[in-house]
Amino acid sequence: MEFINVGDIVSVPFNVACGRCRTCRAGDTGVCLTVNPGLPGGAYGYVDMGGWIGGQARYVMTPYADFNLLKFPDRDQALAKIRDLTMLSDILPTGFHAAVKAQVGAGSIVYVAGCGPVGLAAAASARLLGAAVVMIGDMNKERLAHAKEVGFEPIDLNSHDRIGELIEAVIGEPVVDCFIDAVGFEAKGHGGAEQPAVVLNQAMDVTRYAGSIGIPGLYVTKDPGSHDKQSAKGALSLNFGLGWSKSQSFHTGQTPVLRYNRQLMQAILHDRIPIAKIVNAQVISLEDAPKGYVDFDKGEAVKFVLDPHGTVAKAA
């Protein structure tokens, strides 16, 4: 290790990447070819991602540290924004990657499916990229209320799931330029029934011809807990012919955090994106983590930040 010193404050991407293989050199650090003997891509504390010990602990070992770690340039400046900077490890780059891949730009009309932290980060990223309207849909009323409070257009899916009609009520037409799926395979249809493909099919339905769909939501190669035999094998019932006929673009996969985290750090340090407020970040101790998991699983409109050494709480 040559460039990181004792006492530096750094951000650790959730990806584990070597920095030397073909995909890393191309900037696709989410699918590093060398850090996982089972398949491309490594991550901390996640099944099938190379056996790297998770980061929700007092200490973590980071391989290839000079390549993977993002050092904050000024300690005092970083501590002043530390709650926001904690989001650089995962959800902010993930949301930004989704918005970029959905081709959000100046004047775009954007719909984000899912009002959790990643969905809110995607909505914030769309706004940063110049979107004219950012709608965000969910059935969780607490999360919808928070989304409205931080400046997004909430779409309440409790009444019905005809997304086009709900979008038309906001912008006057039932189509969007850019669609972001921040839900993934755990999606449920109206009424709460398991429908792993429902968001993807809605995306193809309401995204305009030649529009783009960014998919940060997780989809798996197999889902043993699914009640549907096809979904259990990772096979979804997609209306893909519709997407093909509309010349839509689809972008999936793990976010290559290193592609974006330095630029997003600058956006945070220079007050362009108050991401901690947007995702309602709440700092808790490592001892309180089990309760945090339970509360988050209940759908609370909070992004918990584990603070094992009290550094974040002291700075805030």
Predicted segments, located by residue:
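NAD(P)H dinucleotide-binding glycine-rich loop of Rossmann-like/cofactor-binding domains
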Residues: C18-A113
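C-terminal hydrophobic helical "lid"/dimerization subdomain
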Residues: H160, P174, G191, Q254-A316
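Conserved S-adenosyl-L-methionine
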Residues: L128-V133
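Glycine-rich cofactor phosphate-binding loops and adjacent beta1-alpha1 units
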Residues: A102-V104, A145-S247, P290, A313-A316
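A glycine-/small-residue-rich N-terminal strand-loop-strand element
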Residues: M1-V16, P73-K81
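Conserved acidic E/D residue at the C-terminus of a beta-strand in Rossmann-like folds
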Residues: D138-M139
